[in-house]
Amino acid sequence: MANTSVRRRQLLSSVLLLQWLTTVLGVAWGPNPIDGSKHGQFPSLRRTEGVSQSGSGHKGSVYRIPLADMTFWSWMSYLKELPDIDESRNPILKRLLSGSFLRRDGSTTVNVRVPARELVRLLSLTPEQQREGVSAKVRLINLLDPKYSVYEPYLYREILPKRSPLLLPSLGEYRGAFLTYIFHPLSKGLVGDMLETGRSHPDVQVLAANMVAALKSLHNLGLLHRSIELNSFSVLPDGTVVLGGLDTAAPIGTETRLWVGFFGQETAPEIDRNFLADLALTQGRHTVKSDVYSLGVAFRNLVQLLGNGNIGPEDRGAVRQDHLELLDKLSQKMIEEEPGNRPTIEEIMKDPLFEGLNFEDIEEGKARPFRYKQNRL
């Protein structure tokens, strides 16, 4: 047993060393968009003034290199162009500089219930947003792998529309001393967590439709999510359910790295699941149908949570048994092992579960799946 453990540690060390050497060689030999001398296959990067895709209203940069063609130097250049934030002027953010709050992967999320005056000014928060608070999604700046630090800010500033009703909005993206930040409205909680506490009042039909419409809106932008689960969805202060966790998103039809590391049970069976594939963090088989599979697993978990009494007795009337049964049948179709046998998003929207719903209203963010106002978790 001890020898096996030692061999596995040696294998892990070897793989990580190989990844590090690959990164270093990429730095040494990769094209540098700043000087343009080695850019035969790519157009030059030129910063043009434009409104940021985030809600902060600050100026963003528009890159001509497609996301799938971004190189090490492209990400490094983009990291340098992120607007600065002075953590020392924000007491809660200042505590992050010690590094003790970061997880092992160099990330964390911090809730700022009472934003400091400097943060209010920086994010141009309205009085209502000040009262509701904000959250900060934080990542350590990794100079050996700048994409890790700046990938999600890039999506919000360059790809996602300024207003997308069913995607978690950004209030601004910044670079600090050694951390990058994305600020979001402070939500009431994550859908999975809210259901597990038994303090929620969900309309199952509307909630499931909202989740389908949110995924459709992401696919319409040409992006896969690749890591959907119940807690990928947040409930905003106004009751809207939005899709977040976009750091795992990638263009449809491309082979790109997925930075979340090991996969859970939500991953479609056609995705590589062997030990070395997980270590390499390289997944090349994600498709629209693999997102459908993950959403189907989320639906199955939703049925289990609500069907096992994880809601208060006063909520029982808000959860219709026939909707749970229809959702269970739909989830079984979505988690078929063969991708070709899974329904498309359009076919899912026509399922009997959603009979009588107006998906146009749902796609515009008018639905409120949780019927009663809840306190934050």
From Swiss-Prot:
Residues 39-58 are annotated as: Disordered. Disruption phenotype: In a mouse infection model, tachyzoite growth, conversion to bradyzoites and cyst formation are normal 4 weeks post-infection. However, cysts are smaller and their capacity to cause oral infection in a mouse host is reduced which is probably due to their increased susceptibility to the conditions in the host digestive system. It is found in: Secreted. Forms a complex composed of BPK1, MCP4, MAG1, GRA8 and GRA9. Interacts with MCP4. Interacts with MAG1. Interacts with GRA8. Interacts with GRA9. GO terms for molecular function: ATP binding; protein kinase activity. The protein kinase domain is predicted to be catalytically inactive. Required for the growth, maintenance, and/or stability, and thus infectivity, of bradyzoite cysts. One of its GO terms (cellular component) is extracellular space. This is Bradyzoite pseudokinase 1. Keywords: Secreted, Signal. Residues 48-354 form the Protein kinase domain. The keyword Secreted applies. Residues 1-26 form the signal peptide. It comes from Toxoplasma gondii. It comes from the Eukaryota.
